[in-house]
Amino acid sequence: MKKIFFLLACVTSVAIAQKKSDREDTIIRKHAVQSFHDLQEILRIPNDAHFPKDIEKNIQWCETAFAKRGFITKRLETPTVPLLLAERKAKKPVKTVLVYLQIDGQPVDSSKWFQESPWTPTLKEQATDGSWKVINYDRLYENINSDWRIFARSTSDS
């Protein structure tokens, strides 16, 4: 009997610990919505690794985006395209967080995409027959539906 109560207490405490407050949910949604414009913007920039000029445009976009967020960026030159190091120091550092971001993509065959262009982020929802139907991208700014998907080249990497 003691084991049952112990297990019940553990399960209940885990469930309570995982629940987000309404305030946290509001903050998360606010920042998610604010990020949709940036996501759409970077997905519109071709990033085929075989074209250094495309990668340069992506690096420039990242430099600007990081600078807006208080990061200092530094290019690390390589024999091909530069790497970008972005750093933001905390006032009272406790731990270091390292995030790896990949901005180059593989070549894409545009004829195999079921939309205008792989470089045009397109919001879709799944129909009852399993196909994906285009919906207005601006709907993301009004409401977030976790069943919607953004289709564009490199979306899963961004």
Residue ranges of model-derived segments:
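Acidic/His- and Gly-rich active-site-bordering loop/insert found
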Residues: 18-157
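Bacterial Sec-dependent N-terminal signal peptides
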Residues: 1-20
